[in-house]
């Protein structure tokens, strides 16, 4: 579950009453300081949104829409995502029973099981490109039935937009003609399939920079 780009209806907020801080919001400075305090080692965490919301907690207002800039070039987006991945893996110690604190040492980790799951899910997402590339390579050169492995990876990449398209067809707004609704859904599907095609084309590079960020972080830690 990607907490950063699927904020219209948030599963964590809907089911557990606890959202994920996504970098924009209103917060009580004093309450935030009391909650986080000396929890984190200085200058050791690049990605702090989820870990801070785990301690301070956050609620999500799904009806509020915010806008922010997005990198104009793929290279800039890669640098940003690589920094995020490094930050996510810096949070690996907070999955353990005892976590680091400011000034050195460790203390009992007070994060809830839900907060730890969010951290783990972020780590899982950074492993998706390397895993998909590994499946393709193993399917082509090691396992039998390479076509089946290839189709499986393609289904994972292109299956979600097709499922979203099927669901979107049932959500026509009142006053919108069926033809206009269908055209809008087809346009959205086409754009998403193009983005996913680029994801497939860039898969080797995406796998490389994910592994590079992960291994650099683990080595330095």
Enumerate the predicted regions with their spans.
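Non-transmembrane catalytic domains and loops of membrane-associated enzymes and transporters
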Residues: 1-200, 206, 213, 217-221
């Amino acid at each position: 579950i990607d907490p950063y780009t699927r904020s219209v209806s948030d599963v964590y907020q809907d089911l557990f009453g606890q959202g994920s801080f996504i970098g924009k919001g209103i917060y009580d400075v004093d309450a935030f300081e009391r909650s986080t305090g000396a929890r984190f080692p200085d200058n050791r965490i690049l990605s702090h949104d989820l870990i801070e919301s785990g301690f301070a907690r956050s609620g999500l207002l799904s009806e509020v829409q915010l806008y922010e800039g997005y990198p104009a070039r793929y290279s800039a987006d890669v640098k940003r995502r690589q920094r995020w991945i490094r930050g996510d893996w810096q949070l690996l110690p907070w999955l353990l029973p005892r976590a680091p604190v400011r000034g050195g040492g460790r203390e009992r980790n007070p994060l809830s099981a839900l907060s730890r799951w969010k951290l783990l899910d972020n780590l899982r997402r950074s492993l998706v490109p390397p895993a998909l590339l590994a499946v393709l390579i193993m399917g082509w050169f090691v396992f039998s039935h390479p076509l089946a492995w290839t189709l499986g990876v393609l289904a994972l990449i292109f299956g979600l937009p097709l499922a979203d398209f099927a669901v979107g067809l049932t959500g026509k707004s009142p006053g919108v003609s069926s033809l206009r609704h269908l055209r809008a859904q087809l346009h959205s599907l086409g754009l998403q399939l193009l983005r996913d095609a680029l994801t497939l084309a860039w898969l080797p590079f995406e796998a490389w920079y994910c592994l590079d960020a992960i291994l650099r972080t683990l080595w330095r830690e």
